[in-house]
């Protein structure tokens, strides 16, 4: 059966548009360790990649009996934003890829809108991606489909006509649950942590790629496939 034509590309932000995961994980691990939560960067990658900070906090409460207050959130925000402004880089080739795709694009991320906008501004992508959707806008974050369905609705595109570009297992699950095709991007600096690629393969995305310009061919291939309905 032929696929529906691709009319919208939905990008995750962290680890897809910007190479932020190593910075984010480093900041989170330090903040958790400061509260005597014995967790490593490897564990954070495996358990929380692509998930919201609310999920992290709930895990701290239920598994470690640690109840972080507002100061925990402020520490993360301050440390993260400082390092983003100093260190954050766009994913190699992403600006040119967006310019070449020739179809509407938007961002759907587990992060707060303020953080997404900062990431895109620091890396020079904000003007290319003005349509931003955050997990704070929906009841359930990834791996639930709510965020991607909300983005598609707001962009006036049916789920079947959307392609999601994700780097996390939770994001891939969310895209599939939303009835969208999903391409797994493995070109971020975090892609070599133990078990990462095997977990992505287990979830069977429509494609796996590690160089952002390859997305142009993948989207055009699926766009052409859809035109033969």
Regions found by a protein language model. Name each.
Residues 31-32, 52-66, 119, 152, ...:
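Helix-loop "lid/cap" segments that line or gate small-molecule binding pockets
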Residues 30-35, 93-103:
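A short, Lys/Arg-enriched amphipathic alpha-helix followed by its capping loop at the start of a domain
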Residues 23, 48, 52, 75, ...:
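Short beta->alpha linker loops
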Residues 25, 29, 53-58, 73, ...:
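An amphipathic alpha-helix signature
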Residues 38, 58-96:
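Metal-dependent phosphoesterase signature
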Residues 2-46:
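Active-site neighborhood of HAD-like aspartate-dependent phosphohydrolases
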Residues 2-7, 95, 99, 112-113, ...:
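Asp-based, Mg2+/Mn2+-dependent phosphohydrolase catalytic module
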Residues 34-38, 64-68, 124-128, 156-157:
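Short helix-capping segments at alpha-helix termini
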């Amino acid at each position: 059966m032929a696929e529906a034509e691709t009319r919208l590309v939905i990008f995750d932000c962290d680890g897809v548009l910007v190479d932020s995961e190593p910075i984010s994980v480093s900041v989170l691990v330090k903040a958790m360790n400061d509260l005597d939560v014995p967790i490593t960067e490897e564990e954070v990658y495996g358990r929380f990649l692509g998930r919201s900070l609310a999920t992290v906090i709930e895990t701290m409460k239920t598994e470690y009996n640690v109840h972080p207050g507002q100061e925990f959130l402020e520490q993360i925000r301050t440390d993260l934003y400082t390092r983003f402004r100093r260190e954050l880089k766009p994913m190699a080739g992403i600006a040119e890829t967006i310019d070449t795709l020739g179809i509407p694009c938007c961002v759907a991320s587990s992060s707060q809108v303020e953080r997404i906008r900062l990431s895109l501004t620091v890396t020079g992508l904000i003007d290319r991606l003005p349509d931003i959707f955050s997990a704070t806008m929906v009841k359930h974050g990834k791996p639930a489909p709510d965020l991607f369905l909300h983005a598609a609705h707001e962009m006036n595109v049916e789920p079947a006509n959307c392609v999601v570009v994700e780097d996390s297992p939770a994001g891939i699950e969310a895209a599939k649950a939303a009835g969208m095709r999903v391409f797994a991007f493995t070109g971020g600096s975090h892609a070599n942590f133990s078990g990462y690629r095997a977990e992505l393969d287990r979830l069977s995305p429509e494609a796996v790629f590690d160089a952002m310009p390859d997305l142009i061919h993948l989207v055009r291939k699926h766009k052409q496939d859809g035109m033969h309905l």
